[in-house]
């Protein structure tokens, strides 16, 4: 895995915040100052962060308290529009470095430093969906989380 990725550039070379803004506006949603600040906070943290941690960061930048429930609503909008991914086991969020890609969530989560790397593996996702379908289960949002130690922490 190499070094932790703290890049704020989307794969196409567009700044990540601009790619997120473009995707949200394409979906018919406004890119407000609050949404921009929340997205920037998620992207800058570089590892899974709770809504409370994000609210604290945004509150400091705004100079006034931002309620975690407001942050949750915006994070839910971001998740629905593929701008942010939810790390289910930690009830935390990470910026999606590829807002235009629609892949299932596969995370490699470091138990030591907390970093989470999102991996795209359509073959594995297809296998999980097929296994679910074989049992009559309609998978809507497969999430796979693998816990261990990243290359930096080994």
Task: Cite the ranges covered by each PLM segment.
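Short alpha-helical segments that sit at the start of domains
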Residues: 5-39
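Short amphipathic alpha-helical elements of helix-turn-helix/winged-helix folds
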Residues: 23, 40-45, 57
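Short capping segments at the starts of secondary-structure elements
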Residues: 31-33, 44-50
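Basic amphipathic alpha-helical segments that dock to polyanions
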Residues: 71-81
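Non-DNA-binding regulatory cores of transcription-related proteins
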Residues: 79-154
């Amino acid at each position: 895995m190499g070094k932790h990725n703290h890049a704020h550039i989307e794969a196409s070379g567009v700044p990540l915040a601009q790619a997120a803004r473009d995707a949200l506006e394409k979906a018919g949603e406004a890119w407000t100052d609050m949404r921009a600040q929340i997205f920037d906070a998620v992207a800058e943290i570089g590892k899974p962060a709770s809504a409370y941690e994000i609210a604290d960061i945004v509150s400091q930048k705004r100079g006034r308290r931002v309620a975690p429930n407001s942050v949750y609503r915006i994070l839910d909008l971001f998740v629905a529009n593929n701008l942010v991914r939810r790390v289910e086991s930690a009830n935390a969020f990470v910026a999606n470095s590829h807002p235009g890609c629609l892949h299932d969530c596969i995370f490699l989560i470091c138990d030591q430093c907390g970093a989470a790397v999102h991996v795209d593996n359509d073959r594995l996702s297809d296998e999980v969906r097929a296994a679910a379908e074989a049992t009559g289960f309609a998978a809507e949002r497969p999430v796979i989380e693998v816990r261990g130690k990243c290359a930096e922490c080994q």
